[in-house]
Each structure stands twice: as C-alpha cells, then as structure tokens.
C-alpha cells in the first residue's frame, strides 16, 4: 500500500471519528456532570421514564416513548 493511500485512509478515519463525536454531542449524549437517574433493575423490569435518558449499571440509555424498550450503550461493567 502506498504512503499516500495510507495517509488518505488515516485522514478519512479521523474525519469519520470527529463526525461521530459531533453527532453524539448534538443528540444530547450524556455529559459527565449531568446527573441521570440510575435504574439498576431495568434488565428485570424493562421499565424506564418515557423518552428520558438514564443510567443502567455503567451504561447510558434513552427510554422508548412507551416507558420501556430503551436504547443503551453496551459497555462491559466492572464487577463489584
């Protein structure tokens, strides 16, 4: 692979990463200083505050419009 192609691919990767970060910020990604409700039993009850962000264990979620079926990050949480 030529050096020019490698540099081009690297620049493309950086641009995609920067775009993804900007979109996450626009979509209201949780800020570290923002206090979100912690719902530890979401995995059992599947209930959450409709259309609201919350934390489930170490993951960030946004609840669905009917108060269930949230969309969450999928980080592996450390065991306590």
From Swiss-Prot:
- Cellular component annotations (GO), alphabetically ordered: extracellular region
Q: In which tissues is it expressed?
A: Expressed in the venom apparatus. Low transcript levels are also detected in other tissues.
Q: So which domain of life are we looking at? A: Eukaryota
Q: Which residues form the signal peptide?
A: 1-24
Pro-segment residues?
A: 25-47
What are the recorded GO MF terms, alphabetically? Answer: serine-type endopeptidase inhibitor activity
Under the heading Pfam families, the entry gives: Pacifastin_I
Instruction: Read off the InterPro entries from this record.
Output: Pacifastin_dom (IPR008037), Pacifastin_dom_sf (IPR036201)
Which keywords, in A-to-Z order, does the entry hold?
A: Disulfide bond, Protease inhibitor, Secreted, Serine protease inhibitor, Signal
Asked whether the UniProt record includes Secreted among its keywords, one would answer yes
Protein name according to UniProt: Small pacifastin protease inhibitor
Q: Where in the cell is it found?
A: Secreted
Question: What are the annotated disulfide bridges?
Answer: 48-63, 58-77, 61-72
**What role does this protein play?**
Parasitic wasp protein that may interfere with the host immune response. The recombinant protein inhibits trypsin activity and prophenoloxidase (PPO) activation, an enzyme essential for both clotting and insect innate immune responses. It does not inhibit activity of chymotrypsin and protease K, and has no effect on phenoloxidase (PO) activity.
The Pacifastin domain covers: 45-80
Into which family does the record put it?
A: Belongs to the protease inhibitor I19 family.
